[in-house]
Amino acid sequence: MKNKVLFIIALLTFQLHAVSEEGLHHYIKEYMTKKLHSPITKIETISSYPIQGTHGWEVYFLSMNIEGKKRAISKVVFTKGNKISFSLKDKSKKEYKDILKPKVPDSSYDDKHLLVGDKDAKHKILVLSDPFCPYCQEIVPKLIDDVKSNPKVFALYYYHLPLLRIHPASDTATRAMLIFQKRGDIKHLKDCYHLLVSPREINADVVLKAIKDKTGIKIKRVEIYSDEINRELKSDRKLKKRLMVTGTPTIFIDGLWDPTREGYKKYLKK
């Protein structure tokens, strides 16, 4: 398959060998410093892997710290041999930077995030979800049920990603879900996807009442705002940033992003 590649740049014209990761960092650091008119103080590779069907192209997901800036910025770069490109398109003219994401780090598959399934299952699924996201409400409860019915096939790792700007009620609901998750109470965690309360509700007491009405379980404010719950939410947000996730639900199968959100179904028993 021939790919249209834009902005291909030779790292060093006299080099004949492939670009090393160190060489890539050096070039990108100098290039971005000139472009941003600010020094890049740190650059690291978050994830990299060969792109199937591209005859040797690899994708690098980079994180860069800029002098004077609190937040790191991300950059997607493609390499092949001694070439570097900021743009690579597939046969249908889609930008690979729009259809690829970093691989899930192995450390994310830990016991505290294993919601259902066997940790030694053939396939690992990781989901980032918001209980008030309409697509999440449609997809995620079914995903949980499918994994629960096929524990030897799948292990489902659940991360919370409340979209607070559009669903402020998700803050309280997500905190309650973390409590249910820690208790191993999958049923009531799923119930939080169908609460009779506005997604725009900002009063925690109103949302907690909706949770009690739906589940029969009373959760106190002091429980949802504990240091432990705060740490868990902060940890989940870090993964969102690492994986360059921008919306929900975002699903990864065996480490790779599944933009269809249904890729796991091909492994279900017929």
What are these regions (language model features)?
Residues 106-123, 148:
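A short beta-strand-turn-helix
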Residues 80-108:
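A short, surface-exposed interaction/processing loop segment used at functional sites
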Residues 4-14:
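Sec-dependent N-terminal signal peptides
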Residues 55-57, 72, 111, 120, ...:
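Extracytoplasmic
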Residues 111-115, 129-134:
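Non-cytosolic head/periplasmic domains of membrane-anchored proteins
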Residues 19-86, 200, 209-270:
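C-terminal cap of thioredoxin/glutaredoxin-like
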Residues 126-131, 137-215, 241-247:
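Structural alpha/beta surface segment adjacent to cysteine/selenocysteine redox centers
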Residues 118-121, 132, 248, 260:
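Mature, Sec-exported extracytoplasmic domains of Gram-positive
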